[in-house]
A protein has these predicted regions:
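Switch/communication elements of ASCE P-loop NTPase nucleotide-binding domains
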Residues: 1-125
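Short acidic DE-rich linear segments
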Residues: 128-131
C-alpha cells in the first residue's frame, strides 16, 4: 500500500499502525500529538481517540496532545473512563493573560475547555441573532 495515495485522514491511522508494528512506541514512552483529529471526520475522531486511549492503556505511554475539537476531547474523556485509565489523564487549558502565556490544570473543571472551544459558535449565534 502506498501511503501517498491515501487521504490525509487515513494516513493518520496508517502512521499510527506503522509506529505500533515497527516497535517505535515503547512501554512507558511518550507520544506527542498536535491536533491529530484535524483531518478526521467526527466519527473517525472518536475512533482515533479510542485507539490512543487503548495504546496508553496497553503500553503505559505518556500521551501529550493538543486539540481544538470538542468531539475529540469528549471522546478522550469518555474512553479514559471506559478503559479505566481516567486516573492517569490530566487536562490543561492554555490561555494568555497580560501578554503572558499560561497553562492551567483544569482536570477538575474540564468544562473550562469546552467553554473556550464553544466560544466561536456562540459568537456566530450572536451574529445570527442580530440579522
Amino acid at each position: 500500500m502506498n501511503v501517498r495515495n491515501l487521504s490525509t485522514g487515513l494516513k493518520t491511522f496508517v502512521i499510527l499502525k506503522m509506529l505500533l508494528t515497527s516497535g517505535v512506541i515503547e512501554r512507558n514512552g511518550t507520544i506527542i500529538l498536535d491536533e491529530p483529529e484535524i483531518h478526521l471526520h467526527p466519527e473517525w475522531q472518536l475512533l482515533f481517540a479510542e485507539l490512543i486511549v487503548l495504546i496508553q492503556k496497553e503500553f503505559g505511554v505518556h500521551v501529550l496532545l493538543n486539540t481544538h475539537s470538542p468531539y475529540f476531547l469528549n471522546a478522550i474523556e469518555v474512553y479514559t473512563v471506559k478503559y479505566g485509565v481516567d486516573d492517569k489523564c490530566k487536562y490543561y487549558l492554555a490561555f494568555s493573560k497580560d501578554d503572558i502565556s499560561n497553562i492551567e490544570d483544569v482536570t477538575d473543571n474540564i468544562e473550562a475547555i469546552y467553554s473556550k472551544l464553544a466560544r466561536p459558535l456562540q459568537d456566530l449565534e450572536n451574529e445570527r441573532g442580530q440579522l
